[in-house]
């Protein structure tokens, strides 16, 4: 099944027709266009129920997240031994973080050929996913600053403005300056660790990189990957002077360290607790404001059509 979001930023009717024609020349293909939010979830769930071999999503990260959640049962009752269709991605959004992290070509037509080659060769791999009690995430979730940015960007898209790297950067800067005077904080709990008090923003990553500034990779948790647990990146300050050196390290891909920063690249569980609801985003979609939210990791949760990766050897 090919699920296409016709409203995604980088899709066009001609491009969609070309990649659908190319795929249908190689495989029996059911093409479905999404018409509303949540439709990719519904279509992927149908594909799982009807025993499709593979679901290919041509759209942005939001559509891919919906499809992944449709392919899998909710985390609270997921059966890891139950067969599910594999997930493949042809980039169609503005960021395409998940596809880029998997090693999929950013050009949709080249990505289509890449997916065909991988399917013909039987290439697939299992990846771990992060989740709350009722929802899976593919690459990142967060409370505080990044969720504020995502919320602001969604408002701008609804107002008819295109999501571009420059607009994301400007929205991030202005949101950061606005939030620097905010008193909203939350605490962070990781089993076996001291409680982190007064966090201002926190990222929970399922892989790295999970964010980009145009073509530049930003790695908040360099050692986190689909083969590890979750990465946690929590800052207890939004002060500009304290965060400028940290931002410089992130932009230069140096090891991100700071006195006001807690970082761990491999945990199985993390909980955020706030006195008042704070914005939360998941895979680049704003999901609401929460006081308490828990994130866990599930290894080998999803089969993806993607190039193989070399996992660094560990020494003991």
Regions found by a protein language model. Give the residues of each.
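Reductase modules of NAD(P)H-dependent flavoproteins
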Residues: 42, 69-73
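Glycine-rich phosphate/pyrophosphate-binding beta-alpha loops
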Residues: 142, 146, 203-219, 286
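Gly/Ser/Thr-rich active-site loops/lids in small-molecule metabolic enzymes
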Residues: 155-167, 209-239
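ATP/nucleoside-binding phosphotransfer catalytic cores, i.e., glycine-rich phosphate-binding loops
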Residues: 190-191, 219-227, 234-316
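Short conserved active-site loop signatures built around small residues
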Residues: 40, 61, 122, 202
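Catalytic core of DAGKc-family lipid kinases
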Residues: 3, 13, 72-88, 92-201
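ATP/NTP phosphate-donor binding region
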Residues: 1-58, 65, 311-316
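Short acidic/glycine-rich loop or secondary-structure boundary segments that cap or lie
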Residues: 146-149, 196-198, 209-214, 240-244
């Amino acid at each position: 099944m090919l699920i296409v979001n016709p409203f995604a930023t980088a899709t066009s009717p001609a491009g969609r027709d070309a990649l659908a024609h190319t795929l249908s020349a190689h495989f029996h293909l059911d093409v479905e266009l999404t018409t509303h939010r949540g439709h990719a979830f519904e279509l992927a769930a149908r594909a799982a129920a009807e025993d499709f071999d593979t679901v290919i999503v041509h759209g942005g990260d939001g559509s891919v997240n919906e499809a992944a959640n449709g392919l899998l049962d909710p985390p609270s009752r997921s059966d890891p031994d139950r067969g599910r269709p594999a997930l493949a991605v042809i980039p169609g959004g503005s960021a395409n973080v998940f596809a880029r992290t998997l090693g999929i070509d950013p050009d949709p037509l080249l990505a289509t050929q890449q997916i065909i080659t991988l399917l013909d060769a039987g290439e697939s791999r299992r990846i771990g996913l992060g989740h709350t009690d009722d929802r899976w995430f593919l690459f990142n979730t967060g409370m505080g600053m990044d969720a504020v940015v995502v919320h602001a960007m969604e408002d701008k898209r609804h107002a008819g403005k295109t999501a571009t790297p420059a607009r994301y950067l400007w929205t991030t800067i202005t949101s950061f300056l606005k939030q620097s005077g905010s008193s909203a904080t939350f605490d962070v709990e990781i089993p076996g660790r001291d409680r982190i008090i007064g966090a201002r923003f926190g990222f929970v990553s399922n892989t790295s990189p999970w964010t980009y500034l145009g073509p530049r990779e930003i790695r908040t948790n360099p050692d986190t990957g689909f083969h590890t647990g979750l990465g946690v990146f929590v800052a207890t300050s939004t002060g500009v002077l304290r965060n400028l050196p940290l931002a410089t390290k992130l932009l230069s891909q140096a090891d991100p360290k700071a006195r006001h920063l807690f970082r761990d690249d491999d945990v199985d569980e993390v909980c955020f607790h706030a006195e008042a609801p704070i914005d939360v985003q998941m895979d680049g979609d704003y999901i609401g404001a929460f006081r308490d939210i828990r994130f866990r990791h599930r290894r080998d949760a999803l089969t993806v059509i993607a190039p193989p990766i070399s996992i660094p050897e560990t020494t003991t």
